[in-house]
Regions:
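Sec-dependent bacterial lipoprotein signal peptides
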Residues: 1-12
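Compositionally biased intrinsically disordered regions enriched in Thr/Gly
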Residues: 14-252
Length: 252
């Protein structure tokens, strides 16, 4: 079953611009087949701009959100269309792959564990904070495709509210920023991981800028995903550096 629901309108403060946003909510709950408990669960919740910015900027931002959530195969569709088509395609793939797996088990006289044929995908996107004319957007995706546990990946996008373009790390910082920014991130790593035992289990303490960052009035925050610098159990690690420490690294 596929359900679309338009969330209530809200205001996102973006510097001098008040950008109206809405949330696209989609849910899919699909049983693999009658008589079995295996199922597919999909939840999509994506904030996107709807007003108080130019149509060109709005479309550029929505296209970037659609691209990161659904991929190139759904380019050119608006968010609702992309969410619907992606969901339908994912349901079809689920049935094709898992029904074939079930047949293989049955052909060998085996009974698969229910977890092997369960699937979950949660796609969540939301605007966080702003800095000058830049609005940060965080996209989180959780996926489970059998096995011991699922995985979550966080990806940040930074939108120029004058053009709708995604600003990359190399475009935001001045050339040669890498070493000084890495030093600042390492200096604040312990604040992000205050527990000594957790700190000791990290893969490395020599972290570097990875292009995955958000901005706010307070500073910049880098996101390090599961397994990137620490074990899965620690989840994503967010390291923040105040502007006062890195202002000379930023392009004006």
């Amino acid at each position: 079953m596929l359900v679309f629901a338009g969330a209530a309108m809200m205001l996102a403060s973006c510097g001098e611009t008040s950008m109206k946003v809405e949330t696209l909510d989609t849910a899919v709950n699909e049983a693999l087949m009658a008589g079995r408990e295996d199922s597919l669960h999909v939840v999509i919740s994506l904030e996107y701009p709807v007003a108080n910015i130019s149509d060109e900027v709005r479309k550029a931002i929505c296209d970037s959100i659609s691209m990161i959530a659904f991929g190139q195969d759904y380019a050119g569709l608006d968010l609702k269309e992309a969410a619907g088509k992606w969901s339908a395609d994912y349901v079809r793939t689920y049935h094709n792959e898992c029904e074939e797996t079930l047949k293989l088990y049955e052909g060998n006289g085996d009974i698969p564990m229910s977890s092997e044929l369960n699937r979950e995908r949660y796609k969540t996107g939301y605007f966080t904070e702003t800095y000058k004319n830049i609005a940060s957007y965080t996209y989180e995706e959780y996926f489970y495709e059998g096995g011991a546990h699922g995985s979550t990946v966080e990806t940040a996008l930074n939108f120029d509210l004058e053009s709708g373009k995604v600003i990359t790390e190399a475009e935001f910082f001045k050339p040669g920023y890498e070493e000084k920014l890495a030093e600042a991130l390492m200096a604040h790593l312990r604040e992000a991981v205050p527990d000594q035992e957790s700190y000791d289990t990290m893969f490395t303490h020599e972290i570097k800028p990875n292009g995955n960052f958000t901005v706010s009035e307070q500073g910049v925050t880098y996101i390090y995903n599961q397994y990137e610098i620490a074990p899965y159990s620690m989840g994503a690690i967010h390291v923040s550096v105040p502007w006062d420490e890195i202002r000379d690294l930023i392009r004006e």
